[in-house]
Amino acid sequence: MDMLLNTARAWGLRLDQRQIEQFARYSAELRAWNTRVNLTAITDEEGIVARHFLDSLRCALSWGDAPSSLIDIGSGAGFPGLPLKILRPELRVALVESVGKKAAFLRHMITVLDLRDVTVLTARAETVGRDPQHREQYDVVTARAVAELATLAEYCLPLCRVHGRVLAPKGSDIADEVARARTAIERLGGRVIDVEPVTIPGVEPRTLVVIAKVAPTLAAYPRAVGVPARRPIH
């Protein structure tokens, strides 16, 4: 876990001994569960630290004013939501994962890591986005490797409060994807404020798309389950 500690420190993020132990346990449990549930193609500890933990923690440099709540869309094995919860234990976190076996892993990790104020929602993002308990209730919305940005915007922006942020970790060559998504982002009440380069030791260059929520999302969005992916807003 030296790379985790040292890179986090270089980014100005402090991790204490308990947090390092939580990350070590997370890595071990992820590898154990991965033998029976398809959670990740990355199974060596160094890869898990670099491509999952550090890629997740990098979001904390871009979430603006200290948030009190975060929702992670398509959480899968918990990235980036759970590492950000470990980093900031005071965060109220919701993890949206529609696949039952992956949701079971998330609940297991919450128990094993003794995390408080974390909810797992076994549902589709479109359904959660229409629920008054969740709609426009979160300071930060994250989503990693879920969909193209135009579709992702329709999953995420309805859940983000005005003045909050959507953070979308992406690969390096995304200029065209961002351009295709601008109409959708603006219609949903957002604005792209940055596309930040991300450098992680041993990992190919990545980016983080930062979207500010500048206006409420129209009641027509999100559309029915499956529609944002089949017919993105253009």
Swiss-Prot record:
Principal location class: cytoplasm
GO cellular component assignments: cytosol
Subcellular location: Cytoplasm
Keywords recorded for this protein, A-Z: Cytoplasm, Methyltransferase, rRNA processing, S-adenosyl-L-methionine, Transferase
InterPro entries, sorted: rRNA_ssu_MeTfrase_G, SAM-dependent_MTases_sf
Single GO MF descriptor: rRNA (guanine-N7-)-methyltransferase activity
Pfam family, one: GidB
Positions with a binding annotation for S-adenosyl-L-methionine: 74, 79, 125-126, 144
Domain of life: Bacteria
Record EC number: 2.1.1.-
Protein role: Specifically methylates the N7 position of a guanine in 16S rRNA.
Family per similarity comment: Belongs to the methyltransferase superfamily. RNA methyltransferase RsmG family.
Record-given protein name: Ribosomal RNA small subunit methyltransferase G
